[in-house]
Amino acid sequence: MYKRQKEYSVYGINDFVICAGYKQYMIKEWFNNYFLNTSDVTFDMTDGNKVILHEQHSEPWRVTVVDTGENTMTGGRIKRIQKYIGNETFCMTYGDGVCDVDISEIIKFHRSHGKLATLTSVLLDQSKGVLNIGGDNAVQSFREKSKEDSAPINAGYMVLEPEIFDYLDGDECIFEQAPLEKLAEEGQLMSYRHRGFWQCMDTMREKIQLENLWSHGKAPWKVW
């Protein structure tokens, strides 16, 4: 989560809304204790238990952590944060993948076509949503992937207009199914094609691989 925010912050995006669920209180505690945990601290018990933080490190962030429920589906979670988004265009991403995509280029592409939604596509053989993309980068169809497929997949970096909230209904709504399928059918879903590094972290093997890249200073997604 912290690394995802560092990534977006490079491109000037510093206002975050986190769709929290399971153990959401731990996320809130982490931010609440951020300065305490990232600074040298003096506990002066001779002066009324005074706490002095030394060389405080801060980020230029505004973070809203929203309890969207433990069992809420992806579309339902996005719907629950609508009041914090308002009428602004916003970026949306997941926390289970890493990528070296230039987020400013995704936003630039999104603004160029005037549609409601832009997702980032990559060419990998993974069990993600399959895209049928036309020559004009319009997503002609969207569906969940089967093992027989080998096609562009949804990399999870999106730019969305506030009108997409009209496509979401209730906690059982799965964003990657009916909403994206309908947006594609209506010609309102576009694809930004990324041909650089992307990797999800769905298995222990993938976790070990990515941690190894990070620990050896070879993480392509570390753009900060």
Identify the meaning behind each predicted range.
Residues K3-Y94, E105, T203:
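Conserved N-terminal catalytic core of the sugar/cofactor nucleotidyltransferase
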Residues N14-F16, L116-A117, Q188:
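Residues at the starts of beta-strands that form the adenosine-phosphate
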Residues A20, S121-V122:
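Short beta-strand/turn micro-motifs composed of small residues
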Residues I27, I81, D96, H110, ...:
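Residue-level signal for inorganic ion chemistry
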Residues T46, V66-T68, T120, Y192-H194, ...:
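Conserved beta-strand termini and adjacent loop/short-helix elements that scaffold enzyme active sites
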Residues T72-M73, V130-F142:
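Acidic/His-rich active-site region of diverse nucleotide-sugar glycosyltransferases
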Residues T89-C91, V98, D102-R111, L123-Q126, ...:
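Catalytic-core segments of class I nucleotidyltransferases/pyrophosphorylases
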